[in-house]
Regions:
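Nucleotide-sugar donor-binding catalytic core of glycosyltransferases
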Residues: 2-23, 27-53, 62, 84-87, ...
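A short helix->loop->beta-strand "cap" motif at the edges of active sites that frequently abuts
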Residues: 99-102, 123-124, 260-262
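Short N-terminal targeting/anchoring amphipathic segment
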Residues: 5-6, 69-87, 104
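A short, well-structured beta->alpha microelement
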Residues: 56-71
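Short amphipathic alpha-helix with an adjacent loop that forms part of the alpha/beta core around
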Residues: 68-74, 153-154, 291-299
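Pol beta-like nucleotidyltransferase catalytic core
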Residues: 259, 263-338
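Active-site proximal beta-strand in glycosyltransferases
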Residues: 81-84, 96-110, 127
Length: 338
């Protein structure tokens, strides 16, 4: 079986899908749009001029060409999965569809943030982690996945009580300002990192605002590699998870916390409806930061049952999205019949 994954793998999550498929003996490939680079300085300068004067992003066009040209080299696929297809034009997706009888999409952002309504008709199956989009458009519900092993290596020493890394987002920044006051009152040792090109705005605000925010929050323009993030998780008791505006689906932090057996603090109310929710492990704070107290940090993590843990693994996710168990069973029946 040949399966191709097409995505803009910014945080390097999607390559785990390909790796796990290959471990299952499937001929899997990954077309990562984020891997496309300018050929030279002239191409970069040309794109900058085009964006300013023609309102046209040549790099966006080149990425589409990169996807199609790579797919031509790979040839026909049994299944193709496109993650968050807002980065692809209608015609590009239509051409991708010509290479497979079964085109799938997984949306791990809501359609309010990245509208793609006009492209939905091109897909044979669409999965989404957002309940409201599932209800409105008839998508199939699926969560993000735990891509880590069942027994990941833990740190020898815990350095902090709480860790959080996030891309720059106005809503999150607003909540973090309130949160730093509470963390300070509780004397919680924490490391919070905000990443993005827009962090300069916060750096300007810090010149005239409370020093408490700058004491607790690190602002940086360049991203932190996922391996570094995972190392930080190991060295902390609790992982913080704050939603984007309009988000209901569970972020990867939830499943990373599950894998490392770390407690979780979140403002996402949908987590209360999941079968793995346990108030000893997960603190839902909503708008009431008074719920954040020392006892949550002091009590140990309560290990969830193995069967429940495996329900949210990448292995189980792949079986559902690509129908792998059904395919393998059909192969067994064919071999038995012959």
């Amino acid at each position: 079986m040949k399966i191709c994954i097409i995505s803009f793998d910014y945080w390097n999550y999607d390559h785990h899908i390909v790796k796990k498929l290959q471990e299952k003996g499937i001929d899997a490939s990954h077309i990562n749009m984020g891997a496309y680079k300018y050929k030279n300085f002239g191409e970069r300068a040309s794109n900058a001029i085009s964006k300013i004067f023609l309102n046209k992003n040549i790099k966006h066009v080149k990425r589409q060409e990169y996807v199609v040209n790579t797919l031509k080299k790979l040839g026909p696929q049994d299944q193709i999965l496109v993650l968050n297809p807002h980065t692809l034009d209608y015609q590009t997706i239509k051409e991708i569809k010509s290479y497979t009888p079964y085109l799938i999409s997984y949306l791990y952002d809501n359609l309010e943030r990245f509208p793609i309504e006009e492209k939905l008709e091109l897909f044979n199956k669409i999965y989404s982690f957002e309940d409201k989009d599932v209800k409105k458009y008839g998508f199939e519900k699926i969560t993000n996945y735990n891509y880590l092993s069942e027994n990941p290596i833990q740190a020898e020493e815990i350095e902090n009580d709480l860790f959080y890394i996030t891309s720059y987002d106005k809503r999150r920044i607003k909540l973090l300002r309130k949160l730093t006051v509470r963390l300070s009152a509780l004397e919680v040792r924490s490391k919070i990192v905000v990443v993005g090109k827009q962090v300069w705005k916060e750096k300007l605000k810090q010149l005239s605002s409370s020093k408490l925010f700058s004491k607790y929050i690190q602002l940086r323009k360049t991203p932190i590699y996922i391996d570094e993030v995972l190392d930080e998780y190991k060295k902390n008791k609790v992982i913080l998870d704050l939603m984007r505006d309009g988000q209901e689906g569970l972020s990867f932090r939830v499943f990373e916390a599950m894998a490392f057996e770390k407690k979780l603090i979140t403002d996402n109310p949908s987590i209360l409806n999941y079968d793995f929710y346990d108030p000893q492990n997960i603190l839902y704070i909503a708008n009431d930061l008074e719920l954040l107290n020392e006892s949550f940090f002091d009590t140990p993590y309560k290990r969830i049952p193995t069967e429940l843990f495996r329900k949210y693994t990448l292995d189980n996710w792949l079986n559902k999205v690509f129908g792998l168990e059904q395919t393998l069973n059909e192969k067994k029946i064919t071999l038995y019949s012959s």
